[in-house]
């Protein structure tokens, strides 16, 4: 084993547990934060990178570009998941947050359509694909990292994945409220929309550093590298795979209602931008506070080892997300 695959003793102290939660959840929070920022400021971004005579067409193209990132997610999930099974959870997590930071940096510094023409939307698409690729492998790898470090409290520790998304939503919507209420439309379109992306860019290196301070999970060190993780998945775990896809698809679809909420309020209801963002803040606060309590309940009602395996694969833990609906 290399130094990177040396396991630390079980992290049972309060400080060690918090460090584990922060290190594991920071990437998940960053990816959801960046997704929300793009979705929340879609109206502005559409004018900067996808100008069209019809604003509705411009917005649809912007949201379509947002959807392109989902095409890269399965590829990223397969690649980074298999990479984590071979090289370790820590290696996969440091790689995913590095790729996410690069994608966020591209959005922060991206020149407008007025500056570079057609190159601008092409670069936006490239940034979304990179972001989607890294996000695809982040959630499962970081959840496995948490659960494998603390299998005795798997429900509680894994619940912070959803709670961190709520916190990310609070920060993103906070930026939305402040910027839309405190800046003119011209300033927001000129440079103000870049501020929340720049904030996300600052989080990335911090998360990368924190993750490098943690050791590999005891479970991975004990089991060793998997030589054919994809073959094992499709042959031996196909039933769990199908169940996971269905459960995550159902729960994730509800999550993106939160992303579209401000845009819907602006375009369809003709409400001020701040109103849509305020509604999103309330939903995010509920998610942040409620989900860890559901995680505690999950640990209390757990009665079998098979629950742990299901938890790692994600299809039972997906019920935690329903707590914020």
PLM ranges: what are they?
Residues 38-39, 238-287:
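Extracytoplasmic gate region of multi-pass secondary transporters
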Residues 86-98, 300-314:
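Cytoplasmic membrane-interface "Motif A"-like loop-to-helix N-cap segments
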Residues 212-229:
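Flexible cytoplasmic inter-helical loops of multi-pass small-molecule transporters
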Residues 116-136:
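Hydrophobic core of transmembrane alpha-helices in multi-pass small-molecule transporters
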Residues 75-89, 291-303:
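Helix-to-loop junctions at the C-terminal end of transmembrane segments
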Residues 42-75, 122:
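Extracellular/periplasmic helix-loop-helix junction of adjacent transmembrane segments
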Residues 134, 154-180, 203:
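Glycine-rich segments within core transmembrane alpha-helices of 12-TM secondary carriers
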Residues 51, 98-117, 313-325:
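C-terminal ends and interior cores of transmembrane alpha-helices
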């Amino acid at each position: 084993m290399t130094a990177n695959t040396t396991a630390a003793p079980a992290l049972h102290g309060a400080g060690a547990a918090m460090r584990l939660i922060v290190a594991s959840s920071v990437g998940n929070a960053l990816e959801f934060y960046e997704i929300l920022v793009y979705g929340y400021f879609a109206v502005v971004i559409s004018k900067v990178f996808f100008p069209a005579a019809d604003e509705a067409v411009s917005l649809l193209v912007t949201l379509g570009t947002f959807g392109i990132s989902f095409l890269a997610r399965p590829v990223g999930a397969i690649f980074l998941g298999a990479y984590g099974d071979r090289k370790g959870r820590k290696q996969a997590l440091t790689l995913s947050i590095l790729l996410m930071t690069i994608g966020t940096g591209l959005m922060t510094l991206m020149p407008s359509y007025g500056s570079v023409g057609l190159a601008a939307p092409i670069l936006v698409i490239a940034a979304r694909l990179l972001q989607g690729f890294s996000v695809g492998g982040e959630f499962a790898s970081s959840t496995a990292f948490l659960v494998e470090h603390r299998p005795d409290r798997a429900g509680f520790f894994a619940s912070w994945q959803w709670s961190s998304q709520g916190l990310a939503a609070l920060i993103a919507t906070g930026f939305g409220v402040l910027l839309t209420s405190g800046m003119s439309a011209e300033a927001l379109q000129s440079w103000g929309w870049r501020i929340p992306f720049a904030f996300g860019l600052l989080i990335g290196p911090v998360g990368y550093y924190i993750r490098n301070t943690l050791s590999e999970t005891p479970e991975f060190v004990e089991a060793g590298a998997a030589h054919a993780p994809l073959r094992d998945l499709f042959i031996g775990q196909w039933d769990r795979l199908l169940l996971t896809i269905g459960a995550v698809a159902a729960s994730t679809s509800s999550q993106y209602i939160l992303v579209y909420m401000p845009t819907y309020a602006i375009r369809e209801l003709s409400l001020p931008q701040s109103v849509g963002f305020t509604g999103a803040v309330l939903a995010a606060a509920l998610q942040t506070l409620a989900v860890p309590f559901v995680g505690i309940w999950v640990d209390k009602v757990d009665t079998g080892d098979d629950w742990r395996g299901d938890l790692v694969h994600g299809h039972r833990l997906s019920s935690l997300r329903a707590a914020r609906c």
